[in-house]
């Protein structure tokens, strides 16, 4: 019976430790490259779209950025923006994400003006201030928009319209910044 206890100890403890070690290594070896290829695929599609139609790209990025943020996939696009800035001195994608952020501000402002519930008014006002100063949309996105499909759709439409306009005007940034009032100076670009 003592031998059975040792076998159980070895099976559950040592094999468990090896399972964690090998599981993480396999994740890095298998899942890591898949993430890289998905990110590169997104990058290629976005750059191809920008070359073909700034308006369509603006609609897709401006309207779809909050969906990408809600799944955490938006981080795959950030290296593209950084590379564009280092290679060309400006980037077309970053301003399109601004459209999403300001559409979230607009939606939260609409909720603030229409809501009767003081807690909802307070939450939406906090969201407006947070996004305007720091460009962090996640609290408002998950706390208010994802829960209400009409608000989420309104934000997506607003972001798409704003993105289309920014794409039409070929607006660029010269810095890798997230869309807020404090980052407007990044739009001052010469010879873009």
Where are these regions (language model features)?
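Short, proline-centered helix/strand-breaking motifs
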Residues: 1, 136-139
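Signature of multi-pass transmembrane helix bundles
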Residues: 1-66, 183-192
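Alpha-helical transmembrane segments in multi-pass membrane proteins
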Residues: 3, 7, 11, 15, ...
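Transmembrane helix-loop junctions in multi-pass membrane proteins
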Residues: 21-42, 71-78, 109-114, 138, ...
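Short helix-coil transition sites and intra-membrane helix breaks within transmembrane domains
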Residues: 31-35, 53, 68-76, 99-102, ...
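Transmembrane helical segments that form the transport core of multi-pass membrane transport proteins
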Residues: 42-96
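Transmembrane alpha-helical segments and their short flanking loops
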Residues: 51-55, 80-83, 118, 127, ...
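Membrane-embedded helical hairpins/re-entrant loop segments and their flanking transmembrane helices
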Residues: 79-137, 144-149
